[in-house]
Amino acid sequence: MDINLDPSRDDLPLMANTSHLLVKHYVLDLDVDFGSRVLEGNIVLFFGDGNRCKKQSSSSQETFQMESEEAYILRTAEPCHVPKMDSNTFSPKMGHREFAVFGKSDQDAFDNDGNHDNKEHDSESSSSKYCCDTGNHGREDFLLVLDCCDLSVLKVEEVDVAAVPDLEKFTKAPNLTAAPEKRRCEIVRDLVALPADAWREQLDCYTRCSQAPGCGELLFDSDKWSLQIRKKGVPTAADFPHAIRIWYKTKPEGQSVTWTSDQDGRPCVYTMGSPINNRALFPCQEPPVAMSTWQATVRAAASFVVLMSGEKSAKPTPLREGYMSWHYYVTMPMPASTFTIAVGCWTEMKPKTSPLDDLTEHTLPLRPSDADFRYGNTCSHMEYPCRFQSASAATQNIIPYRVFAPVCLEGACREALLWLIPSCLSAAHSVLGTHPFSRLDILIVPTNFPSLGMASPHIIFLSQSTLTGTSHLCGTRLCHEIAHAWFGLAIGARDWTEEWLSEGFATHLEDIFWAEAQQLPPHEALEQQELRACLRWHRLQDELQNSPEGMQVLRPNKEKTGHVSASGASVVKNGLNPEKGFMQVHYLKGYFLLRFLARTLGEETYFPFLRKFVHLFHGQLILSQDFLQMLLESIPENKRFGLSVENIVGDWLECPGIPKALQEERKAKDCSPSRLVRQVGSEVAKWIRVNRRPGKRQRRKREAAFEKLSPDQIVLLLEWLLEQKTLSPQTLHRLQQTYHLQEQDAEVRHRWCELVIKHKYTKAYDQVKRFLQEDQAMGIYLYGELMVSEDARLQQLAHRCFELVKGHMDKASAQVVTEMLF
């Protein structure tokens, strides 16, 4: 694998050799320093046996590809001189200047190899740097490879778990005749294998072991994408230390976290869904198969709130004057990419209700659904304390929740968000059953957040753009992110290129949840869903016209989907393409596929199946064929309408462009549009007539003729009006007044800004400027529209807005805009 891939252009390498050792638990211990914009401290990793030692499922056996292991064995080299350090007195605050000095020629070679240690320390390095000689010096050492990028690793050491008292209560009797190294490995193997009902004791053991002293430094090196660790004289993964501690600090420019200011102008830092995931936050195993639990202690100034994707609502512990410590944990194994942290001066927004009605503290009882227990209480995932086995969790339609935001957004949160949460959570439960996670925090993130929302275990990030206009955009986006609790988190894609398994499901389910949350009658729900399908059809056509064919395929690896190397390493195709984050093909084609299946097989068949699928596959990683095969096998052959896994994969997942079945469906809809779509068409015709006859008398005559439209209808209206070659300033002014466009939600205002730019409506240029500054999650493409207008004033507006926001803009977004402007 080429470790020198261009990080701005190529595929994303997943370097960790998970087939040899698997991280089972992480313990993070970090300090937040807003002055230097770094997180600093240590992380302890507890390992279990890798995938090569485990029996693969039949699905895994079909897709697991073995390659040569030669690239993952390091020939033993003579280490550079390493002065001894007392690990018990090591402080994470120690800078590089407290480490050993070695010759400049060695440092130059280190940098050329891709080391990311700070460049200013030309004559210094970590105490555990070793000289790598590819020549054969005799024995081979096992090399542990972790995914890592833009971290300053200071020290790596083995943890002496054997020094922790009373572990024998939870582990097998120690073999006192065995070597100390072997005893330590045996203790960790026993610890990670404790049963689910001993999770509290296991968590306590992890905590105490993470605080044990070091018992020897390990040799390490790093390149652009990984951290490599070895212990001299240890040739196999089985004998490699199973508990290691890594002292490190992040870098201000690291892409896993964003250091910025919130809407009140106060400093904050948060994980923003980077293409490189969390590897610039902590050394980890990135491949999704590396599912682990974790716990984290984070210290920050007392004025800050620390939020994380943890199972309990952490209460801060006072430390020295002016500082607090926050502790979170999870017991459900998840990929490291799902770890989320946000630190800022957030304020909890509480609904104004009586204590009995306060749904943030109480949950409403619901009759247990027979559907949730038809399939039995046996789960198919690895053992952990699972909510799907709990009768009380099955009846909990509204899980406890909290909302955090800057103080200046309190009014907007109360008006647009707080009252929606119970109905959206309850709607999701009515469709899919047991909530996979026990609680939910919702955070309104800073303006530079690059999307409308992001879901992680126990926490959802929402853009402030969702709080504008009516509750419609906020409700649909909240439903989308809630859906990810099941599809994307509780059930994940085993191959990250199959993004549709997360986004397609969430997009399809958001409409179902939202209709249920509004308690719409079936015919109104159907009308609303047909309207949104029409909108998505327009967007999909635009996406496919403006994207390369290679990025239109939902299963780009085809028959190699799910394949990894012998070590467990792999590559995510287009994972680092900055434009990919702004594409919606996986959302839209995935949505239309699921909609097609639900309509073809019947919703009365599809949604009960989906509930069953969730019950059987939660806590696991899947491929497309796992879902499709179970779906079709649950339906008698004479009711499958000729569908097969092969033709669905071939027509929908492995071909670019628009599937034939979708073309035929949309052609039929064009001939017979739904009522809400017809209503929009009628209004468009009125506006076209107004635009042709702009006289004052005609305007007055038709003033009351325009019907009230929903936000989705207004979006469709504006999209159709964008197809008109010219619209007069008078028509645009009247449009704005009729629908109060500047007060609508961000989706509507985005289309309005497109009209303003296309027709150079100067009176609304300030609204475009405001949108680019306050709605960065949606404004990227407007920069392109401004530039292709070939209007000097509009191009100047684009440059001015970019200058104002680029210092705080998401890096991928800034890169795309830079390419548009320069």
Swiss-Prot record:
Sites annotated Transition state stabilizer: Y587
SUPFAM superfamilies: ARM repeat, Leukotriene A4 hydrolase N-terminal domain, Metalloproteases ('zincins'), catalytic domain
Cellular compartment(s): Nucleus, Nucleolus
Keyword Zinc: yes
Role: Aminopeptidase which catalyzes the hydrolysis of amino acid residues from the N-terminus of peptide or protein substrates.
Record family assignment: Belongs to the peptidase M1 family.
Record's protein name: Aminopeptidase O
